[in-house]
């Protein structure tokens, strides 16, 4: 467990990666619980998200989008046991980070996230973004209406149902002030990772959200079947945003997951 030990003492360090339109801010409950329990916990704003000043309409490359995460990981000391936690489409970001920083990462946790094996031809990008027949997404055309969209944001009237159906109203209100368009072109790069056998040796955990109106639990099951993780947990009362709706249960599952790490 993390603490103020010597430079060679192992420290469990959770690094949280948000999904589309969210930012480091959405993990405030989890990071508070983990730090109080003696762990290190860091949440990162990807390019164009949260308080990162980049205009998301200018982010076209997946590496560019993930650059703040890569910078953070490269700076962390070797005695930190890094546990990457990715939410929703942020699962693609943590998978790319796993492939680039395999030797530094001790575990990867996918929370209602796209968990696709590097080199696979399957994609969950569309499965998360497509919900029934409703037009729930607003597209931004930063280069003009005659060019492909540069950004995407869920329409305000749908957010409560799809993102936060079980979450406290104060968190819904907070999110309404902080959500930003996601760089839709950059996110397509999550499907283009090369096979990486070494990265596949790192323990993976999947946490399913059973009352998720955005990422159908049955689709989450298919991800688990295609690329089975070493641990599987189910948040029975969680919407898509477990960090808001069931933070204490999620916290308990994270503690259970890392208890299997060899420190």
From Swiss-Prot:
It is found in: Cytoplasm. Homodimer. Keywords: Chlorophyll catabolism, Cytoplasm, Hydrolase. Inhibited by methanol and phenylmethylsulfonicfluoride (PMSF). Involved in chlorophyll degradation. Specific for the pheophorbides of the dihydroporphyrin and tetrahydroporphyrin types. Chlorophyllide a, pheophytin a and the nonfluorescent chlorophyll catabolite (NCC) are not used as substrates. Belongs to the AB hydrolase superfamily. Residues 13-244 form the AB hydrolase-1 domain. This is Pheophorbidase. One of its GO terms (cellular component) is cytoplasm. Disulfide bonds: none annotated. It catalyses: pheophorbide a + H2O + H(+) = pyropheophorbide a + methanol + CO2. It comes from Raphanus sativus (Radish). The lineage of its organism: Eukaryota, Viridiplantae, Streptophyta, Embryophyta, Tracheophyta. Pfam families: Abhydrolase_6 (PF12697). An additional type 1 isoform with the same enzymatic activity seems to exist.
